[in-house]
């Protein structure tokens, strides 16, 4: 039976992960203030507007101000004010930004190793398994070096709900109905869409409303459900899927390595202390958005919820899962010789985590 990601499971998982890793801080430690430090301003570039996924970054920004008596200004810029969505990585490299939102699928030629976490239909069915996979993979030199080549390092991992699709026109009733459909589908999910006859395209999230409105695309893939509302796609769409769970997208808040090294040690500690609260802020925001969006969509009568049968989903996984994984390995090996090892590690970590969870039930 296919499973969906649970906000509650993520909350529990993150608590366990941080406790085990030593990242979690005690109340006394978290309350430590460093009011005698220097004034520092960091420019953090985010695309789109403030929404559920950015609540984690907002938390870090506020925490930094509170713990330094406003000396450390971790300043967030929305709406591509500082940099286009696909240019944040370049901005970090040249020193124009101290940090920004970076998605591997926006930079496939630059972050090859990170693409393994964008593959469709990986056996990652809930948030705690996702956290274990991210934690394990980001310990690998290949992933660290992928960002390191651009003078960047990962700070906050973006934990996203699985992807669904929202579109205009006649609601699809089977996978056959996706043939010829123009879809915004990123990374490996784009290859999976192609496998069922769709025409995938990659575009930054801020461009999706106009593309759907003008008919450049027929459907848009996004993390369910907050993103559809954040970019107002629910205002111009006629249907959305509920159980495709096509995959996830590997996005992080990347920060400048040189800027990090120049940061006073107490400010570095503050950024690390903020992480558990930042993850909780994201989780809480996802849950709150679902409670608003789903009843609103149902009540509007304008949006048809599309659920596919188990048989249809198994068919989708068969053509859009393992074949896409194998294709990614072959295309990535010239630049990342350990591509197969990375995929094997993802599968091993996820399967062991799933098995461990089942044994505890």
Report the location of each language-model feature:
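N-terminal secretory/targeting leader peptides
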Residues: 29-129, 145-361
């Amino acid at each position: 039976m296919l499973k969906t990601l649970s906000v509650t499971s993520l909350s529990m998982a993150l608590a366990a992960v941080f406790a085990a890793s030593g990242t979690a801080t005690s109340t006394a430690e978290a309350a430590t203030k460093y009011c005698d430090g220097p004034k520092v301003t960091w420019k953090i570039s985010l695309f789109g507007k403030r929404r559920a996924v950015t609540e984690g970054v907002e938390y870090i920004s506020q925490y930094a101000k509170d713990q330094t008596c406003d000396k450390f200004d971790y300043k967030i810029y929305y709406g591509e004010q500082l940099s286009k969505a696909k240019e944040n990585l370049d901005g970090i490299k040249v020193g124009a930004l101290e940090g920004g939102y970076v998605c591997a699928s926006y930079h496939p030629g630059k972050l090859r190793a990170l693409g393994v976490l964008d593959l469709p239909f990986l056996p990652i069915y809930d948030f705690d398994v996702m956290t274990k996979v991210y934690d394990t993979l980001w310990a690998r030199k290949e992933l660290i070096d992928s960002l390191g080549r651009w003078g960047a390092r990962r700070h906050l991992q973006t934990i996203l709900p699985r992807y669904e699709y929202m579109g205009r026109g006649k609601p699809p009733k089977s996978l056959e109905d996706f043939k010829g459909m123009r879809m915004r589908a990123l990374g490996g999910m784009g290859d999976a869409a192609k496998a069922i006859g769709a025409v995938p395209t990659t575009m930054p999230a801020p461009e999706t409303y106009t593309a759907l409105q003008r008919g450049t695309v027929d459907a848009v893939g996004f993390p369910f459900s907050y993103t559809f509302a954040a970019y107002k796609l629910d205002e111009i769409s006629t249907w959305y899927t509920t159980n495709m769970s096509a995959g996830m997208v590997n996005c992080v808040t990347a920060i400048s390595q040189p800027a990090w090294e120049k940061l006073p040690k107490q400010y570095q500690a503050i950024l690390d202390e903020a992480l558990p609260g930042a993850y909780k802020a994201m989780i809480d925001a996802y849950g709150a958005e679902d409670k608003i969006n789903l009843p609103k969509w149902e009540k509007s009568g304008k949006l048809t919820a599309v659920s596919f049968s188990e048989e249809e989903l198994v068919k989708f996984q068969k053509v859009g899962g393992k074949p896409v994984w194998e294709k990614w390995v072959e295309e990535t090996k010239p630049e990342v010789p350990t591509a197969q090892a990375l995929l094997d590690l993802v599968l091993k970590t996820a399967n062991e985590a799933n098995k461990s969870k089942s044994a505890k039930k």
